[in-house]
Amino acid sequence: LETERAVQPCFTRIVLFQNLLSVIAWSVLALAVANRVAGGFEKLLAVIIIPAFGFTPAIADWDSILGSESLTFSLFAISLALLLKVCFKAASDESDGSNSILLTGLTLTALFLWTFTRDSNIYAIAILFVFALISFAIFPRIRKNKGLIIISTVLLVITILGLQSAMESRRWKKPLTNVFAEYILPFPAREEFMVGLGMPDTKAAEYPVWFKENAPRAYARFLIAHPGYTFTSFTSNLGGIFSENIQPYFYSEQTTVRKTLVALNDILHPNTYLVFVLDLLLILGLAFSAFTRKNSDLTAWVWLGVWLIASATIMMVINFFADSIGVTRHTMLAVETFRLMLWVFLI
């Protein structure tokens, strides 16, 4: 159900802050990418396409809505810009200094703030930590990089705090209740599986207690034990996951400017899951070039690209199965990550 957007005077300062942060975030990311591409034409493309990506309705509409999406997108753009700098600094083996300390502090601050805008972001941080450990094993020369050691250590702390916070807050309870009501309890075989894991009758007094203590773990075991269901449920809905590129909750007056922005939005935010396939092909091509040319800059791009694909995929899968309502909204950050990757790596 859509509602016409209207200005709420008591929230204007919050919306103003969200818009200012968004402008800064996407501008910073554009400059960071432009600084890491070689040709003048490519730099020009970066400072045009990336801000346009962030200022078209798929992203910009959320800046005028009170929700976690605006901060999630903006802090993600800032975090990505800083991680890009960290990756290239590590790849070039630059020595530590005052600039490195500042970069480390800014990166950790941005990642910390971004992590706690949405629970699913925690998994991207966990994957980033794993990638850091793998990098220490593969590239011995970065093991003495104090900045990377500090970042990796803090990433582990953020992951632990984030997971603990998500579980203790019980924010998962309502979404998982929706999942059980729609995907588990109406099907006798699935309900029987849960009973085998100790689930009492849903009408029993013990059920709320069991659900509170065991539901996430039991549901995860169900998905792992039924890979066919898990795979087909996810892949059959990919089209729907990628189908939205404008927030569906509020509508705006269809002025000429709005229609032009929507047309540009459809180009920059294609609503097809083929974007995922194109991203994979781009990263594979870069990986081949990095391997054959032994180029440290290409290696940094590949590292960042693989982390983005892994993180976006994990977040999309988790958010897809974590609720039965508002799936496109829950998976939006992952979808927009794939769309952004297309332009960044094409440049």
Give names to the regions the model predicted.
Residues L16-G40, I78, L82:
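Transmembrane-helix motifs of polytopic, lipid-linked glycan transferases
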Residues E42-L44, D96-T104, I138-L155:
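Membrane-interfacial entry segments at the cytosolic side of transmembrane helices
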Residues P9-S22, N237-L308, A312-T313:
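Membrane-interface anchor segments at the N-terminal boundary of transmembrane helices
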Residues L71-A91, T107-L111, L128-F129, M341:
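Specific aromatic-rich, kink-prone transmembrane helix
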Residues I14-F17, P51-L83, W114-A124, I325, ...:
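Multi-pass, polyprenyl lipid-linked donor-dependent membrane glycosyltransferases
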